[in-house]
Regions:
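Core residues of bacterial helix-turn-helix
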Residues: 20, 31-32, 63
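A short, Lys/Arg-rich alpha-helix, primarily the initiator
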Residues: 1-20
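Recognition helix of helix-turn-helix/homeodomain-like DNA-binding domains
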Residues: 32-50
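Residue-level signal for the short linker/turn that defines the boundary of a DNA-recognition helix
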Residues: 11, 21-22, 51-54
Length: 97
């Protein structure tokens, strides 16, 4: 089962993909995946698959979206720098856990 944090990041990527009229096949190609079906599995809450941190980085770059915004909400992005970075690191660790 995916965590709330994993679902948040995956849903943001899906919304970015759909907003730019990009297909799951396009995402699969960006990530050098063998099948767009894997992207479907990642986007589905029914399967445990998730993007790796490297894949999220590639997708954020492709969709011109700040990587940290996958993990931090608007309020958290306004925290002082050190506090924000510490929170971001902890959330990235939680995502990957």
């Amino acid at each position: 089962m995916k965590t709330d944090l994993q679902l948040r990041a995956i849903n943001i990527i899906r919304e970015l993909r759909q907003g730019q009229n990009a297909s799951q096949a396009y995402v699969a190609e960006l990530l050098d995946l063998r099948s767009s079906g894997l992207v479907g599995n990642i986007e589905s809450p029914r399967f445990p698959h998730k993007y790796t941190l490297k894949q999220l980085s590639v997708l954020c770059e492709a969709f011109q979206y700040p990587f940290e915004n996958l993990f931090l909400d608007e309020k958290e992005t306004l925290l002082p720098y050190k506090e924000r970075i510490k929170l971001l690191i902890n959330k990235i660790i939680d995502y990957d856990g």
